[in-house]
Amino acid sequence: MYEPNVVGDWQEYDEHAGLRVRVHGLHAQEPPRGRDAAAEGLAYFSLRVTVENRGPERFGIHLEDGQLDVRIGPDGESAFLDWRNSQFIEGYDIYPLRRATAVLFAAGPEAALARVDIQVHLRIDEEWADRRMWSGGLGLQEDGTGPAAATAHEGLACQVSNFLRGQAEEGTA
């Protein structure tokens, strides 16, 4: 069974040797070019998606509108995505030992931001890679420093894993 990553984790792509992706930098932040009028009353946050090539060959990468899905709160409601303030990876060649990072600005009700799920559907050399998901939340540290951060990561990761196992068991029962 596929389990989501915790925000901050790297995810390898087996079919593309050396290529890996990471969702990180999830924190409250106002957008650089001002708030969108449609996000009135919502709390803004940002996140980063970094693609790294540790392999011997070049990969053409696309990470654009519609390839990122951000869900918030216990019911997984869609976050408001501020495309105007976000920066994507559009047709970029990642050579060996290089990285490219997309920055996404989103917003939602502040109470729902304790749980944020980010799904990434990367396009590599004109082919769609498998979707990958990361789970995190505002207020949780991702760098793993200190015992409190380790407990927060393990707690969220365990909650997500246990929930998904329970759903899978219900489906097979």
What are these regions (language model features)?
Residues 1-173:
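Conserved functional micro-motifs across diverse proteins
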